[in-house]
Amino acid sequence: MSEITYNLKYAMLSLLAVIVAITLTNCTPKTNIPLRIGSNLWTGYETLYLARDLGYYNDQPIRLVDYPSGTEEVRAYRNKEIEGAGLSIDQALVLGATQENIRIIAIMDVSNGGDVILGKPEFADMKALKGKRVGVESSALGAFFIARALEKNDMTAKDIQIVSLELTEHERAYKEGKVDAVVTFGPARSKLLAAGAKLLFDSSQIPGEIVDTLAVSTEAIANSPETIQRVFEKLSEAFKEDMNHADIEKSLRSFR
């Protein structure tokens, strides 16, 4: 995480802290049920797990739940399997269009190169994808990212063949030749780059446009305000730990 990215995240988190504190002051806890928060394998959400492993949540009924991608988190939230979720801002907004009970309480990450489009080694640039098969997750983020990448390269969706893929299918589909390129992130990104895939586009070319958030239900805010406040406050402390200790990144990779 660069110093600029960290400072941006910390500033946004501090601003939201004031808003959340004011909101929660007016809430009276009604229950003490566990707060289930979903997340996926993305660096920005690891701070939740770091805070847990540092013991920051020991006195609170907080349960962290892993999902392969934000798409599964959205599904789980709609099915009432979780009360909170780590979601890209577009996913949170799309979910909010049909689920009026969801609120963003924190900015978790601003993507600066983590979201990528990877292609065959022989592809020189994005324009080499004309007429090619490009794997994309069927999500608002996937659609937004490929659209912006095409726009930045004077291309449109008509120039490529979109192949719908779940995140868990990205690596295999590329290696088996089912697609010529893939829009991906996280472990799949690292593995495909290690296997020789060519980086054609990444989120650093559209700075500030891909933001990851922590969103929770209004019921959770009303029923467990102290728990929500605890999550929020300790995220700030975990961010500081992340910056102050060189071995934190290795620890993050090991506990998931």
Q: Language model features by range: what are they?
A:
Residues 30-156, 161-164, 180-186, 198-202, ...:
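Short, glycine-/small- and polar/acidic-enriched structural segments
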Residues 91, 162-163, 168-255:
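Pocket-lining segment of extracytoplasmic ligand-binding domains
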Residues 23-26:
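C-terminal motif of bacterial Sec signal peptides marking the signal peptidase cleavage site
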